[in-house]
Amino acid sequence: MGFGSDLKNSQEAVLKLQDWELRLLETVKKFMALRIKSDKEYAYTLQNLCNQVDKDSTVQVNYVSNVSKSWLLMIQQTEQLSRIMKTHAEDLNSGPLHRLTMMIKDKQQVKKSYVGIHQQIEAEMIKVTKTELEKLKSSYRQLIKEMNSAKEKYKEALAKGKETEKAKERCDKATMKLHMLHNQYVLALKGAQLHQSQYYDTTLPLLLDSVQKMQEEMIKALKGIFDEYSEITSLVTEEIVNVHKEIQMSVDQIDPSTEYNDFIDVHRTTAAKEQEIEFDTSLLEENENLQANEIMWNNLTADSLQVMLKTLAEELTQTQQMLLHKEAAVLELEKRIEESSETCAKKSDIVLLLGQKQALEELKQSVQQLRCTEAKCAAQKELLEQKVQENDGKEPPPVVNYEEDARSVTSMERKERLSKFESIRHSIAGIIKSPKSVLGSSTQLSDVISVGEKPLAEHDWYHGAIPRIEAQELLKQQGDFLVRESHGKPGEYVLSVYSDGQRRHFIIQFVDNLYRFEGTGFSNIPQLIDHHFNTKQVITKKSGVVLLNPIPKDKKWVLNHEDVSLGELLGKGNFGEVYKGTLKDKTPVAVKTCKEDLPQELKIKFLQEAKILKQYDHPNIVKLIGVCTQRQPVYIIMELVPGGDFLSFLRKRKDELKLKQLVRFSLDVAAGMLYLEGKNCIHRDLAARNCLVGENNTLKISDFGMSRQEDGGVYSSSGLKQIPIKWTAPEALNYGRYSSESDVWSFGILLWETFSLGVCPYPGMTNQQAREQVERGYRMSAPQNCPEEIFTIMMKCWDYKPENRPKFSDLHKELTAIKKKIT
């Protein structure tokens, strides 16, 4: 098998093969040039990346840190990878690409040579086997005619007896010419036969075999070029593998349990002996009746001691109950973290558990603080009980022996002194009757401690990361206040207050580990707010604002981040990722997250959807479960709708869906939109992609991120950054005027999507083309197999004048009637 033996008559095929291979080589050359450019840019990008790394972050700290070492080595090895990639690009340019360029020239020369030689030998063969023989044959025929003519004239001459010799001579001459040409023709024919045989058996096969040999040599050369290309560009070469091995080895050196051992050794401090807290005996220098560390039980304190004992007992019981609750919460959270850890598919999934682990540590701190409070209360209670039990059944002794004093004073003086002591006693009794006054400063301290132990997120007046505008809507009366996390600056907290007819916002300063406005600093925000609320101290002297009424958050919708466990990623929305999640009671949910780096206005739009959905309860509208705004990132928790988005559902199930089911889907959307219309809600983004397929194929409207609720039922927009043009009514596109009528237009498009089984509206048109065509009066034709009644509804929805479009109540009635007709 070969070119010479099998391709003798395949000249055109050989030429096409050579042309194709030349085009292929040009493509390979272009690809290699782009690869070189790409590798050089990649090398430059890597180097630039390393150069931009904060140099301080790569400087070794003053203790041995494997994390720091690993990070430094990552940067160094990335620089090494940059150098390797740059070298590879240069080698690729000087090696395979250069040789490929030379090979293309050689390939062109081989083709040129083949074409030239083939034309030459083919022309020679045609000349010998056809052209020359045809000439001889033509002369042959001519000479036969001449000889026959000479013979006729000779016969005529013999018959007449005139010029016989002359005629004979002419006849002999013509015969000689013919015979000589005959011999020449016989020889030429023999030569042509041999030439043709040589052409097809030797000359042409030799040329074709020569071409095949050069083709194969070039394939061999190309293979060598490819081999060298593969070797140079390989990402598993020893030098590149070593780079990644070095990085992996440095990562493996990181041991969380020993990472800070050296840091501890470097910064270890000798524990200072704590100063013992003792009774200041100097307080007793001017009073001989009081004793250090002794409870005074007398006629002035006996009643108050009983009340104090009762209060301490209640506080101890309450603390112990809280402790049991917190300890149970610790065990529950530990269990959840352990279960979540087992489901982690990737090593980096541990990051998803950090929030829960931090919450666990905070819970443990809370437990420890409660144990401390429990111990203090128990000790104080024991001290009081001991004193009360010692004097059980006894009459409390008087503070002053008035009978002895009476010997040295007049009766008038005695009355005055009795009066003074009675007033003191009544004052104390008044204090005792007021529970808030029990224990005096000791109880106030206890109150502060209990406030401090309660995490910020658990206080009713803390609303989390709600938008400023939403906070302002909640403040309506003088002194109304709440605390929120700044939406624009996560980690910064703001006090929002209604004062003197305006809403004021005060950033809570955090300086020297203390929270304050401009006065006293506190170790946490609850203590700061509690101080200003209880003392009625102004927030700032300049503002004169006083806290009067804490505004509680709506607990129906508020969830803590710890209440939700994130699972698999379901997809990405306009504002962030959407995860499958699980509540504490194992309820599956969908969790929409908001990226922390989004602009302020987009974060507000993100929460707008939750604000709208709080008001709605309908089987054809996706349900809101709650919001997590206590910290960033903010979550919106929705019911998990298992069937996914309607558009994908239509496209996947298009071969299974029957007409009746499509009408039922349409009726579901109409029912949901009828409900929204009654609530003056304008959806503005009604489309198949924004509906979800629930259980029993119930369709639910979702994605209220662009929705607005307007009392007048009309919303004007100065412009949206992303408008779904093919779904949006003309008046909304042209004038920014949105209404339920513009939602009806979108409903018509959704109907078209439904009955076309997921085809994109205005097929073959760009957004701009579709918009221009609609303005000219164009409307889409009915989808294949779409009932005439359904298409009639679509056309009504697409009336250019909003006032002529049907209401959702009309659409619901019509679709209900159509559904009944279909069996």
From Swiss-Prot:
GO molecular function, one term: epidermal growth factor receptor binding
Example GO BP: microtubule cytoskeleton organization
Classification via PROSITE patterns: F_BAR, PROTEIN_KINASE_ATP, PROTEIN_KINASE_DOM, PROTEIN_KINASE_TYR, SH2
Residues bearing the modification Phosphoserine: S434
Main EC class the enzyme belongs to: transferase
Ranges where the SH2 domain occurs: 461-551
Annotated Gene3D superfamilies: Arfaptin homology (AH) domain/BAR domain, HR1 repeat, Phosphorylase Kinase, domain 1, SH2 domain, Transferase(Phosphotransferase) domain 1
Residues involved in ATP binding: L570, G571, K572, G573, N574, F575, G576, E577, V578, K592
Spans annotated as Important for interaction with membranes containing phosphoinositides: 1-300
Any one GO cellular component localisation term in the record: microtubule cytoskeleton
Chain coiled-coil ranges: 123-185, 301-382
Compartments where found: Cytoplasm; Cytoplasm, Cytoskeleton; Cell membrane; Cell projection
Keyword Membrane part of the UniProt annotation: yes
Keywords: ATP-binding, Cell junction, Cell membrane, Cell projection, Coiled coil, Cytoplasm, Cytoskeleton, Kinase, Lipid-binding, Membrane, Nucleotide-binding, Nucleus, Phosphoprotein, SH2 domain, Transferase, Tyrosine-protein kinase, Ubl conjugation
Modified residue annotations for Phosphotyrosine: Y402, Y616, Y715
Domain Protein kinase stretches: 564-815
Subunit note: Homotrimer. Interacts with IRS1, JAK1, NRP1, PIK3R1, PLEC and TMF1. Interacts with PPP1CA and regulates its phosphorylation at 'Thr-320'. Interacts with CTNND1, EGFR, FLT3, PECAM1, PDGFR and STAT3. Interacts (via SH2 domain) with CTTN. Interacts with HSP90; this stabilizes phosphorylated FER and protects FER against proteasomal degradation. Component of a complex that contains at least FER, CTTN and PTK2/FAK1. Interacts with ARHGDIA.
Entry comment, domain topic: The coiled coil domains mediate homooligomerization and are required for location at microtubules.
Record PANTHER family: TYROSINE-PROTEIN KINASE
Function: Tyrosine-protein kinase that acts downstream of cell surface receptors for growth factors and plays a role in the regulation of the actin cytoskeleton, microtubule assembly, lamellipodia formation, cell adhesion, cell migration and chemotaxis. Acts downstream of EGFR, KIT, PDGFRA and PDGFRB. Acts downstream of EGFR to promote activation of NF-kappa-B and cell proliferation. May play a role in the regulation of the mitotic cell cycle. Plays a role in the insulin receptor signaling pathway and in activation of phosphatidylinositol 3-kinase.
Protein name (Swiss-Prot/TrEMBL): Tyrosine-protein kinase Fer
Organism: Rattus norvegicus (Rat)
Gene, per the UniProt record: Fer
